[in-house]
């Protein structure tokens, strides 16, 4: 999982990318391509 300061470019990498909020953190999940996973934060 990549940790990024901004997820805007990550969100547009694939059409299956979804933005989810879990426990106060923002995640990008992709069930089709799991290597697209990312979390926002430093």
Swiss-Prot record:
InterPro entries: Ribosomal_bL36, Ribosomal_bL36_sp, Ribosomal_L36_bact
Disulfide-bond pairs as recorded: none
GO molecular function: structural constituent of ribosome
Example GO biological process: translation
Keywords: Ribonucleoprotein, Ribosomal protein
Superkingdom: Bacteria
UniProt cross-references to SUPFAM superfamilies, sorted A to Z: Ribosomal protein L36
GO cellular component: ribonucleoprotein complex; ribosome
Pfam family membership, one: Ribosomal_L36
PANTHER family xref list: 50S RIBOSOMAL PROTEIN L36 2, LARGE RIBOSOMAL SUBUNIT PROTEIN BL36B
Family indicated by similarity: Belongs to the bacterial ribosomal protein bL36 family.
This protein's name: Large ribosomal subunit protein bL36
Organism name: Wolbachia sp. subsp. Drosophila simulans (strain wRi)
Species lineage: Bacteria, Pseudomonadati, Pseudomonadota, Alphaproteobacteria, Rickettsiales
């Amino acid at each position: 999982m990549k940790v990024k300061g901004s997820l805007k470019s990550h969100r547009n990498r694939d059409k299956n990318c979804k933005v989810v909020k879990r426990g106060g953190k923002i995640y990008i999940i992709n069930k089709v391509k799991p290597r697209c996973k990312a979390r926002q934060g430093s």
